[in-house]
Amino acid sequence: MRYTDFFSIAKQPAVCYSGYREGQYPGGPIPSVAQIKEDLILVAQNWHYIRLYSIDDHTRMVLDVIESEGLDLKVMLGAYLEAEQNNPNCPWGGGVHEPEVLIQNKAKNLKQVEALIEVAHQYPHIVFSLAVGNEAVVEWTDHLVPVPQLVSYVRLVKKHCTQPVTSCDNYVPW
């Protein structure tokens, strides 16, 4: 298979983007529109594609800035998945969670996947591909998702979106 068999876009430089600055983080304070605009104007000078890891307010602001500023950037949009299964192999000890946390995470993950579908429909001219999960099945992760569940999420997204869908994981588990 060739690259062009999957994507109807040109090969161009790409980079993962997270606009968080000192004191900002996912789930906490996020960059302002002005900060995101400043970043993306710089990013667009050297890259044509960016990857975003999750659907949250920061992501929506990034997409809004790309659209409102007419920036020549396309986005691989991701849905970040939280742990649905304990992973005692996590080397930093973060892979073991209380049962109720795992149940809550599964509900959060479904909302994240549904939001991915919604935002992909909202920005089809910017979002060129979709990624479900980020290192969610590797043996060392602290946010392990069972492979059948990951596949289920991917199939749900594929059913409702026209963009290509993938999962971002290390090749070793496969």
Name these PLM-found stretches.
Residues V15, I50, L130:
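Conserved, mostly hydrophobic/aromatic
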Residues H58-V62, P173-W174:
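Short, well-ordered alpha-helical microsegments
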Residues P29-V33, I55, N109, V147:
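A conditional alpha-helix N-cap/helix-loop micro-motif detector
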Residues R2-E38, L42:
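Boundary/entry segment of secreted carbohydrate-active catalytic domains
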Residues V62-Q163:
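Substrate-binding cleft of extracellular glycoside hydrolase catalytic domains
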Residues S18-Y20, I55, G78-E84, V132-V137, ...:
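Active-site beta-loop-alpha junctions enriched in small/polar residues
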Residues Q35-H58:
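Catalytic domains of carbohydrate-active enzymes, especially glycoside hydrolases
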